[in-house]
Swiss-Prot record:
Keywords linked to the UniProt accession: Antibiotic resistance, Chaperone
Function: Required for resistance to the phenazine antibiotic D-alanylgriseoluteic acid (AGA), an antibiotic produced by E.agglomerans itself, and thus protects the bacterium against phenazine toxicity. Probably binds AGA and acts as a chaperone that works in tandem with a membrane transporter for subsequent antibiotic secretion.
Single GO term (MF): protein homodimerization activity
Gene3D superfamilies in UniProt: 3.30.720.110, 3.30.720.120
Ranges of residues in domain VOC: 10-128
Result of knocking out the encoding gene: Loss of D-alanylgriseoluteic acid resistance.
Superkingdom of the organism of origin: Bacteria
InterPro entries linked to this entry: Glyas_Bleomycin-R_OHBP_Dase, Glyas_Fos-R_dOase_dom, Glyoxalase/dOase/EhpR, VOC
A GO biological process held by the record: response to antibiotic
SUPFAM superfamilies for the chain: Glyoxalase/Bleomycin resistance protein/Dihydroxybiphenyl dioxygenase
Name assigned to this protein: Phenazine antibiotic resistance protein EhpR
UniProt-annotated binding residues for D-alanylgriseoluteate: 42-43, 57
Lineage start: Bacteria, Pseudomonadati, Pseudomonadota, Gammaproteobacteria, Enterobacterales
Amino acid sequence: MTDLAGPTITPNLQLVYVSNVERSTDFYRFIFKKEPVFVTPRYVAFPSSGDALFAIWSGGEEPVAEIPRFSEIGIMLPTGEDVDKLFNEWTKQKSHQIIVIKEPYTDVFGRTFLISDPDGHIIRVCPLD
């Protein structure tokens, strides 16, 4: 049995490595429709929910090529209908390139689709669990 004594630990930072912080900041500012809450040349953090942050980081003064640039980032919306609406909104606009990996489909957890950020990280949009 695992010892669960003491304070609970809650994950409150999702960090992804990027090769170009400025380009990725612009991309996520568009995707999240939010301004970052913390900005440096190598690290930028966006508010998520509660005290959680979503952050992008170069990995150092120069991007480290050996660090994999692959994560799956989840965006959960209230309903499957909202998933379809957001897909249509993102793919019809012309200001930002949206790379569609998989168009909306229904999986075991409901409607979902996949896009890619500029570094190849997968962004999955799906309904709340």
